[in-house]
């Protein structure tokens, strides 16, 4: 009820599917997974949530497939003036986030505002100290290995070789 007091829009009575529903004011929600078909649809807002899995780290073609899906599917469906939100765990220097960041070196390509939340801030304090104590984060870092730590916790993927100090 609190939601309904703030937002007057309602779901249409016949909207029952979790991955697709319409509002009484003409809005639509449509969800697919990576590699899912979006042909014939337009979008004012695209939200891409975790296009990679942990298993993708061991499959370079999975990163290529996700990028190909994005560029030939969802990106092509974005209406003029539309927006894209990409929320993901960083996994690799070849993941979708890195590919999009690299592409923006072309001034005509999509330009992204990147918002990152590293587990440990430059001042050495946890980004979320109420949940993660620095001692716990240091334990994760020591247990996970530097490459995983840099990618998943610090939002700064490196190759396994790049994570080693020689």
Predicted regions and their residues:
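Short, conserved catalytic or adaptor-binding loops enriched in Gly and charged residues
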Residues: 12, 20-24, 103-109, 142-143, ...
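ATPase catalytic-site recognition across NTP-hydrolyzing enzymes
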Residues: 124-166
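A glycine-rich helix N-cap at a beta->alpha junction
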Residues: 2-10, 117, 121, 128
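Signature of the SF2 helicase/ATPase Hel1-core->accessory helical subdomain module
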Residues: 45-122
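A short acidic, Gly/Pro-enriched loop at the edge of an enzyme's catalytic core
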Residues: 42
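Conserved nucleotide-state-sensing and coupling region of NTP-binding domains
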Residues: 1-38
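A short acidic, often aromatic-flanked loop/helix-cap motif at beta-alpha or helix-coil junctions
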Residues: 37-39, 121-126
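Active-site donor-binding loop signature of nucleotide-sugar glycosyltransferases
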Residues: 33, 117-119, 155
């Amino acid at each position: 009820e609190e939601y309904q007091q703030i937002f007057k829009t309602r779901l249409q009575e016949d909207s029952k599917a979790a991955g697709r529903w319409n509002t009484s004011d003409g809005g639509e929600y449509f969800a697919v997974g990576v590699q899912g078909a979006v042909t014939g649809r337009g979008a004012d807002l695209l939200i891409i949530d975790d296009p990679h899995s942990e298993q993708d780290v061991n499959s370079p073609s999975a990163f290529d497939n996700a990028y190909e899906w994005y560029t030939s599917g969802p990106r092509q469906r974005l209406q003029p003036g539309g927006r894209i939100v990409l929320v993901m765990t960083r996994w690799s220097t070849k993941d979708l986030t890195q590919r999009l960041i690299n592409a923006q070196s072309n001034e005509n390509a999509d330009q992204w505002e990147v918002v990152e939340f590293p587990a440990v801030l430059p001042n050495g304090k946890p980004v979320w100290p109420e949940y993660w104590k620095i001692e716990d984060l240091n334990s994760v870092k020591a247990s996970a290995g530097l490459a995983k730590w840099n990618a998943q916790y610090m939002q700064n993927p490196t190759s396994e070789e790049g994570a080693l100090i020689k």
